[in-house]
């Protein structure tokens, strides 16, 4: 086990995380499958619609690594896009679009790791209303 003094105090401290390197790896690992109508790259001043119920869910940014990571260190898709778009004069519009499921037992299961701050929540609005909101955000 070793001497307690030799143990690192906090392996997830901000001082130990190499965010620039992690972002570089993420950038290099993305694959563009098809660029229809030469959509990409987006203009720096583009208006972007982000649609999805997990856009602000830090634990879901970790994916299957959620048991080994700390969601407080995760940057959500919405926060990351908002920062990138705002600094370049663009605009990000968000719409939920849908619920993940209508089954309460599934919602409880999906929140078992973060029961104190659930990320999978139910929007009481009708599906048609959420879809209409998403379509409006994309226009």
Residue ranges and their predicted role:
Residues 1-139:
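Preference for extracellular/luminal or secreted protein segments
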């Amino acid at each position: 086990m070793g001497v307690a003094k030799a143990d690192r105090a906090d392996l997830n401290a901000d001082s130990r995380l190499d965010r620039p390197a992690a972002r570089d790896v993420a950038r290099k690992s993305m694959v563009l499958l098809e660029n229809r109508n030469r959509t990409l790259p987006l203009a720096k001043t583009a208006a972007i619609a982000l649609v999805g119920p997990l856009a602000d869910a830090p634990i879901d940014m970790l994916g299957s690594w959620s048991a080994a990571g700390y969601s407080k260190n995760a940057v959500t898709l919405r926060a990351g896009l908002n920062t990138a778009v705002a600094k370049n004069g663009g605009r990000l519009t968000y719409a939920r679009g849908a619920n993940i499921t209508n089954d309460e037992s599934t919602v409880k299961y999906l929140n078992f790791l973060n029961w104190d701050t659930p990320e999978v929540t139910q929007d009481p609005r009708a599906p048609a209303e959420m879809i209409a909101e998403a379509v409006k955000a994309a226009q």
